[in-house]
Amino acid sequence: MAEGLERVRISASELRGILATLAPQAGSRENMKELKEARPRKDNRRPDLEIYKPGLSRLRNKPKIKEPSGSEEFKDEIVNDRDCSAVENGTQPFKDVCKELNNQQQNGPIDPENNRGQESFPRTAGQEDRSLKMIKRTKKPDLQIYQPGRRLQTVSKESASRVEEEEILNQVEQLRVEEDECRGNVVKEEVVNKPDRAEIEKSPGGDRVRAAKGEKGKRIEKGEGMRKTNDDPAQGKPGSAKRYSRSDKRRNRYRTCSTSSAGSNNSAEGAGLTDNGCRRRRQDRTKERPRLKKQVSVSSTDSLDEDRIDEPDGLEPRRSSERKKHLERNWSGRGEGEQKSNGKENRGTLRVTFDAEAMNKESPMVRSARDDMDRGKPDKGLSSGGKGSEKQESKNPKQELRGRGRGILILPAHTTLSVNSAGSPESAPLGPRLLFGSGSKGPRSWGRGGTTRRLWDPNNPDQKPALKTQTPQLHFLDTDDEVSPTSWGDSRQAQASYYKFQNSDNPYYYPRTPGPASQYPYTGYNPLQYPVGPTNGVYPGPYYPGYPTPSGPYVCSPLPASTMSPEEVEQHMRNLQQQELHRLLRVADNQELQLSNLLSRDRISPEGLEKMAQLRAELLQLYERCILLDIEFSDNQNVDQILWKNAFYQVIEKFRQLVKDPNVENPEQIRNRLLELLDEGSDFFDSLLQKLQVTYKFKLEDYIDGLAIRSKPLRKTVKYALISAQRCMICQGDIARYREQARDTANYGKARSWYLKAQHIAPKNGRPYNQLALLAVYTRRKLDAVYYYMRSLAASNPILTAKESLMSLFEETKRKAEQMEKKQHEEFELSPDQWRKGKKSTFRHVGDDTTRLEIWIHPSHPRSSQGTESGKDSEQENGLGSLSPSDLNKRFILSFLHAHGKLFTRIGMETFPAVAEKVLKEFQVLLQHSPSPIGSTRMLQLMTINMFAVHNSQLKDCFSEECRSVIQEQAAALGLAMFSLLVCRCTYLLKESAKAQLSSPEDQDDQDDIKVSSFVPDLKELLPSVKVWSDWMLGYPDTWNPPPTSLDLPSHVAVDVWSTLADFCNILTAVNQSEVPLYKDPDDDLTLLILEEDRLLSGFVPLLAAPQDPCYVEKTSDKVIAADCKRVTVLKYFLEALCGQEEPLLAFKDGKYVSVAPAPDTMGKEMVSQEGTRLEDEEEDVVIEDFEEDSEAEGSGGEDDIRELRAKKLALARKIAEQQRRQEKIQAVLEDHSQMRQMELEIRPLFLVPDTNGFIDHLASLARLLESRKYILVVPLIVINELDGLAKGQETDHRAGGYARVVQEKARKSIEFLEQRFESRDSCLRALTSRGNELESIAFRSEDITGQLGNNDDLILSCCLHYCKDKAKDFMPTSKEEPIRLLREVVLLTDDRNLRVKALTRNVPVRDIPAFLTWAQVG
């Protein structure tokens, strides 16, 4: 406070100069009013706050000067100062002030003790008596306003420049004493001598007045960094502050009482006016209320600002300067210096008046002088913390609002004390209204009269200004947390209130965002208790905690130029906008919580329905406002989905639940409510779509083209707006779908239209495809459902729940396919004679056991064990050919989905070749029909599903480009096979088109080329699918080059893909695609050509890598023919690309294209190689038998050998006898059980499990079985390990060395055979662990069998049992007389008697290899 009050010190010369300058202008009271009216207030702003400028006239630490030697020198100085101020218009005093400021900065930190010493000067007894006499005369509280803390002047320590300072202070004091003696005449003198505003501010006193305004309310005892550097022991305890609470207003413990009314809102005179008892009582009162602060009331000090309305204008400037001077002197002398000075010397009364307008406006010269003074300041710290002028400036706003003086203020006559004098709203008393006014509430503010203190002006007793407007007494709460801003009204920016809880509904919730930007557009409090830097570039940051930020020019005058860059301003405004958006979302969350609680009830009353409608309306308004304010923020916060879920989805589901509830009283009323809600939603989203287009300036018609990649980049806001528009369209489709379900209808055309529009806006989003799949499921179109679910998974942002939906679809398809297969078998078995004939040939009894019956069914025909494959094929072909196109199409779709279900689920892949063969046969027959029953769109869906199967089955963690999984190769083989059949059909149709063109008379001129316009309709239907698959092949060459292993298909179905493509390329070269010219670059008369298949498959991930070059055609050209020309051009480029591969697949030789692709391992070559291997094995068998006979003859000579052989014979005989007894017991048990129930085994051999002896003795036979491609050879891992052990050789007896070498060689050949086949990834060969895990490679074939029960034979048998999945519900008959029927697809191939017996006990079919070869008719 002392720092602020020191600014109002006015020298005598300055005051004399003011009086001399304004003497000619002295006039009547009306002239003063006219002068005041010339400065009107703008927007009800208070002009008394405008004067503040941070960082000016810090004149606290002036150098001290010696006292003048005599009164003559003092008088001469007064005259000189008066002349200077009158002639030079205040220029020199400003230079002196700058000089003093430079000296102050050079002297270092500010010393409060020095300040007191600087302002102390001797006073005479007469002056003291006159001061006391004046105080007694002006004792009434309505005339005097007391400011607390009047200082006692002290003699400070030594200072080099003290003489000059004290000389000025003595002059001011002498002037003040003279004015006290003629109190009654001063008022008139001030009216006459009212100075001009500009001339006042040109003088040094005017500068100090402005400095005092900037420093008002600042207490010298505040515990801050600049006070800590003062080590002067004379300062004492009152000058240092240890507290950091912002609400604790500490006062001088030696503060004296006043002779004025105790109820006044300001303090009394200094220590010289009272005795020690009064001082102690005031100290006690301060201790009792240490935290009372910033009280706002209509008491004496609060009325200062309002009183200025009715007071004479001429009194304002003089009175204002005098009051500031008096308050500065009273405050600057507080502390220890009060005790050291002569307390009875300072008893004069300073009368200071305030001009509400003059205080807030500056003349240009004053502003320039202020700028000069700012420039004259060196960048040195003015505080102990070493802060510069910026820090000091940022501190001034805080100092301004805590003014509390201790002098006596003589209010002029006719002073209006109403709270709305400045035209401010009623909230104005809550903020800092006066320079030393309402913000300076001390402990005495709660004296007699409280906050509604009445003030009377003796000169105008009829007027009672204090009763004009009164504010309610404040309710004080916690004073420690005072960082909340408050509102000032509409006409001014928000300023910090004196107390946080005055007009705040929720004072504890004012969040502040970290960073350079302010939380709100108005200034507030800084929560820190230590000095901080500026918070933004517009307003200087608060320096002290709990103090309001700058008032004055930042409220009432135009804002100064911002130092923030445009980017920072934009970010600042964006932060503010996001805060508003977060607030809206918080409000919406609250509303949604109420709505959810309402919907959670079992029954909803009519009042609840009305409340629900109200909450929904508020939610829609809040969410719509968020979307239209900041579309990017809304997308990040997912406001679109939250809007749909909270305002529509949960309400719709509640109504649907109530409609289905049988206990609901009036379901029709609920249904009508539901339909009204759906209509409301449709209208809302239609409106939102229009508002999005208007707000973000785009048209939806320009973007519903289905392009995933655009030539020109979109604006950021348009991109987000398109995403929001797509979600709105999806919501429209959902509403249309719910409407159909509510009406119990199934016309989903409108919903499908909305979903397709949404897909065209952003094709990479998977949500529209998922919704389209739902519609396909509702309408039982399984192919469409699978297609859209796959599109949903193969999108840039996939819908992962589609995977579960696909799993359920494929499971249902599998059941239907099995039912269809069973139905076909029943149709084949209509003839009972053939069935009995075939049945008798397949029955075989096991020994003499009549209770066990095995029915062996050959895989070539379901009715007979004998039959040819050709007969089966011709019969099935005749059956497919006899079907209608629609029935054939249904059967094909079912088979196609069944095959892809195996590829997707990877279950039942052992039957995939058979299912794929069926798919290809039906597809081939379908293509023969004209017109094609599939259609262009359905054909595109088939190709898309094939692409997805290859894409979905690729290895995720494989970094090698040549690495492909078995599932991926099978999926690629199926796709290429269907593509080859499609290309064959196109080649045939192209030839037909060429023949038709030759027969056409108008095309005889050009017989060599085939015109695109002459294409037959079936060819036009197929070309888009061929083009799309070729695009995929160009984008992913690693999936088909080198070519994958082809499926094992019959010769009439298996087609060489690359030979077919070569033939297609030869016929395609004859097509003239230049019938419609195509252009690469755009032009004014050209238009972009978009193919229908490209638009339909836009956003499909497997096709994103395909080349997508734009193509332009003339606007007048035929778009249909132009599209076919583009397709032909793309196909020609694709076929040329096959010739340009690193390993070319096509080549141009002898004037035509031929296939140069490496031929896969065909069945013929394998047959030849395996036949040669079989002959070699037979020759080796003969040699082995001869070698065994020779070895026996050689070993029969010795007697020891004979005895050993006899002993072995006896041991074997005993062992055989034991086994026979065991077998008899087993047979007896079986007979006992078989008397009650007969068992039938239906054996359809598919999996063949050989043991180790089978590879040693019958390797060639196993190779023939493998080459037949009818069976899958399953090799247990334990058999491979045994073969490895035999191949290494373990000779323990030299006499058996020859046979061991033979066995070792056969085992080695078996291992080589298996490794070769596994390396080539033979689909009919697989390895199986003892736990039932299939292996695609035997590179790692060691198995840990610890914990496995039994020997190796048991492990082999466990592999067979892996394929025997018996379920009681499947084989147990309904009646006791019927036999138990078991289905077996596995056969154990072994000669081991023990293993065969174990297999029979477990109902596992078993045969030796030669017998099975005879039955299977292989070899």
Curated annotation (Swiss-Prot):
Compositional bias of kind Acidic residues: 303-314
Entry annotated with the keyword Chaperone: no
UniProt-annotated binding residues for Mn(2+): D1251, D1353, D1392
EC number of this enzyme: 3.1.-.-
Modified sites of kind Phosphothreonine: T471, T479
InterPro entries: DNA/RNA-bd_Est1-type, Est1-like_N, Est1/Ebs1-like, PIN-like_dom_sf, PIN_dom, TPR-like_helical_dom_sf
An individual GO BP term: nuclear-transcribed mRNA catabolic process, nonsense-mediated decay
SMART domains cross-referenced by the UniProt entry: PINc (SM00670)
Positions of region (EJC-binding motif 2): 133-153
Region described as EJC-binding motif 1: spans on this chain: 39-59
The protein's enzyme class: hydrolase
GO MF, one annotated term: telomeric DNA binding
Quaternary structure annotation from Swiss-Prot or TrEMBL: May form homooligomers. Associated component of the telomerase holoenzyme complex. Interacts with TERT, independently of the telomerase RNA. Interacts with SMG1, SMG5, SMG7, UPF1, UPF2, UPF3B and the PP2A catalytic subunits. Also interacts with the exon junction complex (EJC) composed at least of CASC3, EIF4A3, MAGOH and RBM8A; required for the process of nonsense-mediated mRNA decay. Interacts with DHX34; the interaction is RNA-independent.
Function: Component of the telomerase ribonucleoprotein (RNP) complex that is essential for the replication of chromosome termini. May have a general role in telomere regulation. Promotes in vitro the ability of TERT to elongate telomeres. Overexpression induces telomere uncapping, chromosomal end-to-end fusions (telomeric DNA persists at the fusion points) and did not perturb TRF2 telomeric localization. Binds to the single-stranded 5'-(GTGTGG)(4)GTGT-3' telomeric DNA, but not to a telomerase RNA template component (TER).
Protein name per the record: Telomerase-binding protein EST1A
Organism: Pongo abelii (Sumatran orangutan)
